[in-house]
Each structure stands twice: as C-alpha cells, then as structure tokens.
Amino acid sequence: MYFEITGQNSPAAKTVVLSAGLGGSGRFWQPQLSALGQHFRVITYDQYGTGRSAGVIPSGYTLADMADELADLLASQHIERYHFVGHALGGMIGLQLALSHPQCVERLVAINSWPVLDSQTRRCFHVRQDLLLNSGVAAYVRAQPLFLYPADWLSRNTLLLEQEEVQQIAHFQGMENLLRRLNALMNADFRSVLPHITTPTLALCATDDLLVPYPCSQALAELLPDGEWAQMSYGGHAMSVTNSEQFNGILLSYLLMDTGIAKCELALNQSNTSAIHL
C-alpha cells in the first residue's frame, strides 16, 4: 500500500497513523499534517484498493482484513507502537487494530465512528449506493459533499468543490471496490467486543454531522473501558476539513495528554466516561 511519512524524524519521536474514511485517501489529512508534524512522526496511507494503492478488493472483505493489511505495512517499516487516528471507516479500522493488535496501539481517536451502524447512517449509505448503481460515478461523487459538509461551508467553497469533483471522478476507486468496502463497513458490529478493547480511546464527533448522528460517538465511548468522548458544535461529518483549527486542538490535547503539553481539561461525566469540555 502507498504511504507517506512526514513530521519528526528523531528516533525518539512517537508515531501517529492517520486513516481516512470510505474515500480511503491519505490526502484527506492535509489540514492536520502541519500541527501533528510539530510533535510526531506522521504516517498517512491510501487504503488498499483506493487512490495510489491499486488492487482489487476480494469478495467477503472485512474490517479485520483492512486492519491486518495496515498492521503488516507498519511492521514492514519496523513501526511497532503508535497512536492511531481514524475518520469514520478509519476509526473502525482503529478499533479492529486495538482489538486484534492491542500491543501496537497506544492511543486511539475514532472520529464519527460507531459501535453498530445507526439507522440514519444506513439510510445515507443506501442513498449513496443507489446513486452509484443507478446514476453512475459522477452522480455519486457530486452528491458526496452533501453528506460531508455543513450547508454554509458548501456555499462558501463552490470552486474548491468543483475542483475536487473533477479529481475524485478521475481517480475513483472503482464501483466494485467501493461497494465491497462499504459492505464491510455496514456489516461491522463491535458491541460485543468493545468491553475487551483496553486502549485509551477518544470518540470525537460533530453535533451537526448528517451522516453519523453524534450520539453514536457517546455510545461508543461508553462501551469502552477507557473511553472518552468530545463533541464539536460545527463542522459536519468532515469537521477535520471544515473546522480544522478546533479539531487539531482537540486531537493534540488528547494525543499529548501524558506529556504535560495538552491544554484541554478532562472531566468525568455521569456515565464514568470522560468528556472533553470545549
């Protein structure tokens, strides 16, 4: 799989691995690279079958396959311990890594992820799937921003969206690859195994996320033995893009928590799950 390493190059620097959502591209994390790179060695990658990681996704593909592919890649680079930050599908890959490779994941941030697929998320996925199958790639790509970004942000960024649309159509991962990856995501159910994941985990969400209702993140955190949750009031599903300054601050506060650099205060809520108060 294609990957890039940026940020700190000191042997003593800790590593943070960034995993995108269904689109799969490491380029999704561009707004985070500078902030994270001041403190960490940063690894971004294109998930198998997407972007610059060409390949055909096999039938029966699962999140466990996605996690094992990444674990093997990192092991080949002698990277044995790392923080992991994943957006939606990427967060689910992180949960699977923490379950099947617990010795590798030091801290996990799962952004707009869930214990089991919510009915609203399922509805959105079915609409997107129908668009792809019945109207084609261009219609699928054109509709995608509606699920990712707040309406006012969409209005202010028309030119950027038009440019991205051209690129996304040109580099589309392929209908069969996307549908098999989507099927793996929709079928994932972590409810029975979350109590066994002891990795410190932050479930981060945006209250205006259309695709994944924000209570999914709270439910995820509450099922984890060392789960914490944080909410952003604005940004939509892709708040790492639309509200990157606040997002980066929360991310760094959590990842640097044990270093004394973090600035956000943590307080326990009534469910004994920590919530970051913004």
UniProtKB/Swiss-Prot annotation:
Question: What InterPro entries does the database record attribute to this sequence?
Answer: AB_hydrolase, AB_hydrolase_1, AB_hydrolase_fold, Pyrimidine_utilisation_RutD
Q: What class of enzyme is it?
A: hydrolase
Q: Its domain of life? A: Bacteria
Cross-referenced SUPFAM superfamilies = alpha/beta-Hydrolases
Its UniProt entry gives the catalysed reaction(s) as:
carbamate + 2 H(+) = NH4(+) + CO2
Q: Any idea of its EC number?
A: 3.5.1.-
Task: Alphabetically list the UniProt keywords.
Answer: Hydrolase
A single MF term (Gene Ontology): hydrolase activity, acting on carbon-nitrogen (but not peptide) bonds, in linear amides
* Entries under PANTHER family matching the protein: AB HYDROLASE-1 DOMAIN-CONTAINING PROTEIN, HYDROLASE, ALPHA/BETA FOLD FAMILY PROTEIN
Q: Which family does it belong to?
A: Belongs to the AB hydrolase superfamily. Hydrolase RutD family.
Functional note: Involved in pyrimidine catabolism. May facilitate the hydrolysis of carbamate, a reaction that can also occur spontaneously.
**HAMAP family under this entry?**
RutD
> What is the name listed in the Swiss-Prot or TrEMBL entry for this protein?
Putative carbamate hydrolase RutD
